[in-house]
Amino acid sequence: MIAHSHGASGAPLLSRSVRRALDAMRANVSREWSLADLADVSGVSGRTLQRQFRSFLGKTPRAVLRDIRFELARRELQHGSPDLKVMDVAEGCGLTHFGRFSVEYRRRYGETPSQTRKRQVLFINALASTPAFFIAARDRLVVTLGAIEAGPENGEIARHVADELAIALMRAGVSVVTLPAAASCHLSGTIRGSGKQTRLTLRLIETATGRYLSAYRFDGPLDEHSAPREYLATRIAAALQPCLRLAEIESARRKPDIDLTPQDLALRAMPHVLSLDADGNARATDFLERAMNRDPDHALATALAAWAYGQRVVYHFSATPAEDRARSAELARKAAALAGDATALAVLGNAFTLLHDLDAAGRVIREALAVDGGSAWAWSRGGWIDVYNGDAESAIERFKIALDLAPNDPLAFNSLVGIGCAHFGAGNYGEAARWQQRALAEHPSATWIHRTMCPAYVLAGAKPEARRSVTALREQYPELTIAEVQQGFPPMPQGYRDLVFDALHAVGLPS
């Protein structure tokens, strides 16, 4: 099973013979394709096909077949039914030597096949066991969901998928309607093929302009033997969420200031809150104070403001941390009494963790997942709560679920930071530094990452990298001291905190 979410195709141009060979390999991945077999399918000589594969794909046909097998195995482990066995997946993909499969899988993806499978089972079980309830969308994006086109053999499946998708979108806070004239966006789809060759394709289009906003493709069986359709619909809704949210934000940006509603102001603030940097934070709080002045009971604006004021303390944006912490606490208590959707609840969970109130944070994150089990933000914040409670294994699972759900979300980098922090807590300092360096590469303005990345380098024995890291930290925060780091540090276990502060002292950060 293969699922993709994208806005524009980046697929390379291929010759007809290479495409034919690829189609043949994908249609029968378990077959031991020889070069002669592929040449017969492609209609060219083996030497020509070999040369074209190297020219277009940079690899031999055998290497490409192995890539296809591993990608298929990974997707089946990520999206298959709960009772799927790892060994059966490997054999079905033509990877018959299980020991070699496990070693190569870990080299490619940084985790074992069993870890991928465990995460999938955790997610499906969470969806099945959480009592779902709806919170009516307030001033949210309106989407019309058209019928999913399918042949007679897939007609019933198409109707079930459309029904589950409508429910998943509504749980995610999207207003789903049947009249196109009332909608900002139109979501349509098709189902083609059968069995393992089934393909579900969805397209999200802006109604006013006809512009394609996003697309989603799922390859794999959709019958009763596959994962529950509720699970697939939840994943689709989660993958579309960043694009839908961006469409809302762009709509708010296009409005004249005189026409802005509290929701519009909250949406304008959101990308600045998500930036997790000082400039963005200052712009966000301005928008959010305006929103709350117009509607003191606006749940999203209040939750975002609580988080934004908490960021000022934790990320050292503030000259008055005590005042900002008090303002964050006041707003968080107020937001907890308002009826927010899954997005507002996940944001509120962020605010409570920065206030070191892990019980309240855990409660609202559970509520967020009860509303929308596919909320990547809620899964990620659940991972942070596990980090703060010292449960590295559970934290990494939750962060990776968040990344599986919405790999292109603006907050995805913060899940990478979280994985790094979880590895640090487990004593895997080299891995901790590697994940946090990856996060910093994706979001260079978040220089506060050096606060925990530098100690990871110190404890991993990487002295040159540690010196470069602390230099970058002090360039951004020239007056920063260990006392200020202690004041703004998240609620990590005491042993974790001591390691960080001692390492920062060792590389020269003043007390």
Spans of features found by a protein language model:
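Short, amphipathic alpha-helical "lid/cap" segments that border enzyme active or binding sites
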Residues: 18, 229-233, 237, 497, ...
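TPR/TPR-like (Sel1-like) alpha-helical repeat modules
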Residues: 458-481
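Acidic, proline/glycine-rich low-complexity intrinsically disordered segments
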Residues: 130-438, 445, 450-457
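Alpha-helical bundle regulatory/interaction domains
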Residues: 1-60, 68-136
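Short beta-alpha connecting loops at secondary-structure transitions
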Residues: 57-58, 84-87, 413, 417, ...
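Terminal, low-structured helical/coil segments at or just beyond the last alpha-helical repeat
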Residues: 482-511
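Short, flexible, glycine-rich and Lys/Arg-enriched loop motifs at helix boundaries
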Residues: 2, 79-81, 313-327, 485-490
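Short, basic-rich loop-to-helix N-cap that marks the start of a DNA-contacting helix
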Residues: 63
